[in-house]
Amino acid sequence: MTLALRYKRVLLKVSGEALMGEQSFGIDVSVADRIASDIAEVRKMGVEVAIVIGGGNIFRGVAVASHGGDRVTGDHMGMLATAINSLALRTSLTKLGVETVVLSAITMPQICESFSQRKAMSYMNQGKVVIFAGGTGNPFFTTDSAATLRAAEIGADVLLKGTQVDGIYSADPKINSTAKRFDQLTHVEILRLGLSIMDTTAVTLARENNIPIIVYSIHEKGGLTKVLNGTGRFTVVSE
């Protein structure tokens, strides 16, 4: 059985930094378009797709706290950054004819709909791509935690994390050339080894809800399809 058949509904986590491309800030529209093209390709395979995007290309809440500011306000600013990125990716998907809706954990009715689990499930059952903005809607939680939470809420078969590298390493391979790459890990091993691919809350939530995680490079065109076909280069996290 192929991974495409095993994974009918997926939650894709995309970092905000992935949208920057070669820029140092903001959104590279050509990168957003390429990511959207990969998503459109897997939709044609019949895979239901939901997405959570980070906001680090625009703002990080911890930046405020590190300079003596209020962390809660900083995190709220970060949530708004995820909304900007979500609208950008929706625009790229819409250009390809992919019906897409943005649901936000923080209310902004003039811009997008508010999140509810029932609404998200309804849209996914209609074949629409659903993008979750605003993180969890609460400060002190990362968008990785938001992605795991939404994956649990919609009953996703797997959490796919598109990153800057092709899997999970013992250290940043761009800095440490001797970093060990893992093909397979358990949630417990990630926690025990202190691997920084996701925060502890996200990994624990995935483990408690039996959600496997696949980590792959978001930068390879067609990489998402390869992952779902089981032919790509990635790391699988499961019990």
From Swiss-Prot:
Principal EC category: transferase
Any one GO MF annotation of this record: UMP kinase activity
Gene3D superfamilies per the UniProt record, alphabetical: Acetylglutamate kinase-like
Pathway named in the protein's UniProt entry: Pyrimidine metabolism; CTP biosynthesis via de novo pathway; UDP from UMP (UMPK route): step 1/1
Annotated binding of UMP, by residue: 55, 75, 136-143
CC terms in the record's Gene Ontology section: cytosol
Keyword terms of this UniProt record: ATP-binding, Cytoplasm, Kinase, Nucleotide-binding, Pyrimidine biosynthesis, Transferase
Regulation: Inhibited by UTP.
GO biological process, one term: 'de novo' CTP biosynthetic process
PANTHER family, per the entry: URIDYLATE KINASE, URIDYLATE KINASE PUMPKIN, CHLOROPLASTIC
Subunit structure and binding partners: Homohexamer.
Family: Belongs to the UMP kinase family.
Known function: Catalyzes the reversible phosphorylation of UMP to UDP.
Protein name: Uridylate kinase
Gene: pyrH
